[in-house]
């Protein structure tokens, strides 16, 4: 999730089966950024408490969080503002956030320290590698993908994170009844998401008309989104539920 239209923290899409050597197409761009004092504080003091390292083994998140609770996985939380808002509003839910942009990671960690929140853990690496290796199958209640990079140019469409392989990976990680919730402000990408997910087996579109849902109350409105609304820009939300 991000307050900018292009969140840099999406994963890499495998072009081949996982059992074979993989070439990957990155759906994110690593961007350098200057750290503020608060962001550096977050990394220095918050990472030892809330940070997680990529592992080749499935992680016991019940042990990591110290409880059993509904679990939400967020790809690309940007500067972490919406993540903090969701975590504060739902203390009974555990959040796993992934972001490669270090200032954003620092900002979220600093916010966790400042607000005294304990229901968030953070990775700073390729989100799809975390899903593949660290997250058990059928263990997530929700997966959030808010405002991923739309890769506007046609020659870059292969970089979009939402592809058939992504849909299948997410389906494996969601519980039956779990939901993939996506949002974008770029209508052609919204249509692309809809096409990919409508063709993906094992899902049900929760939209009554089979297209898009109204903005769910649980998704915070970002500053970028408010600016867009004032300019008449649209935002499209999609919710697909795993049914088998």
From Swiss-Prot:
The keyword DNA damage does not apply. InterPro entries: SAM-dependent_MTases_sf, tRNA_(Gua-N-7)_MeTrfase_Trmb, tRNA_methyltr_TrmB_bact. Keywords: Methyltransferase, S-adenosyl-L-methionine, Transferase, tRNA processing. Residues 1-10 have a biased composition (Polar residues). The active site is at 149. Residues 1-20 are annotated as: Disordered. It comes from the Bacteria. It is an enzyme of class 2 (transferase). Its EC number is 2.1.1.33. S-adenosyl-L-methionine binds at residues 74, 99, 126, 149. One of its GO terms (cellular component) is tRNA methyltransferase complex. Pfam families: Methyltransf_4. Substrate binds at residues 153, 185, 222-225. The keyword tRNA processing applies. Gene3D superfamilies: Vaccinia Virus protein VP39. Disulfide bonds: none annotated. Pathway: tRNA modification; N(7)-methylguanine-tRNA biosynthesis. GO terms for molecular function: tRNA (guanine(46)-N7)-methyltransferase activity. Catalyzes the formation of N(7)-methylguanine at position 46 (m7G46) in tRNA. Belongs to the class I-like SAM-binding methyltransferase superfamily. TrmB family. PANTHER family: 3-DEOXY-D-MANNO-OCTULOSONIC-ACID TRANSFERASE/TRNA GUANINE-N 7 - -METHYLTRANSFERASE, PENTACOTRIPEPTIDE-REPEAT REGION OF PRORP DOMAIN-CONTAINING PROTEIN. This is tRNA (guanine-N(7)-)-methyltransferase. It comes from Pseudomonas aeruginosa (strain UCBPP-PA14).
């Amino acid at each position: 999730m991000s307050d900018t239209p292009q969140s840099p923290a999406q994963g890499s899409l495998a072009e081949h089966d996982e059992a074979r050597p993989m070439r990957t197409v990155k759906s994110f761009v690593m961007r350098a950024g200057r750290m503020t004092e608060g962001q550096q504080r977050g990394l220095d003091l918050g990472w030892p408490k809330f940070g997680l390292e990529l592992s080749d083994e499935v992680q016991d998140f019940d042990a990591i969080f110290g409880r059993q609770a509904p679990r939400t996985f967020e790809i690309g939380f940007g500067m972490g503002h919406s993540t903090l808002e969701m975590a504060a509003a739902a203390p009974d839910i555990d959040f796993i956030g992934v972001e490669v942009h270090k200032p954003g990671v620092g900002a979220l960690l600093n916010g966790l320290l400042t607000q005294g929140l304990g229901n968030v853990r953070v990775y700073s690496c390729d989100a799809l590698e975390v899903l593949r290796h660290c997250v058990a199958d059928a263990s997530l209640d929700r997966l959030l993908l808010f405002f991923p990079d739309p890769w506007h140019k046609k020659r870059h469409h292969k970089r979009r994170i939402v592809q058939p392989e992504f849909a299948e990976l997410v389906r494996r990680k969601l519980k039956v009844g779990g939901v993939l919730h996506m949002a974008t402000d770029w209508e052609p990408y919204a249509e692309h998401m809809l096409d990919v997910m409508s063709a993906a087996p094992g899902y049900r579109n929760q939209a009554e008309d089979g297209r898009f849902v109204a903005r769910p109350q649980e998704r915070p409105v970002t500053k970028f989104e408010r600016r867009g609304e004032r300019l008449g820009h649209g935002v499209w939300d999609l919710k697909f539920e795993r049914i088998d």
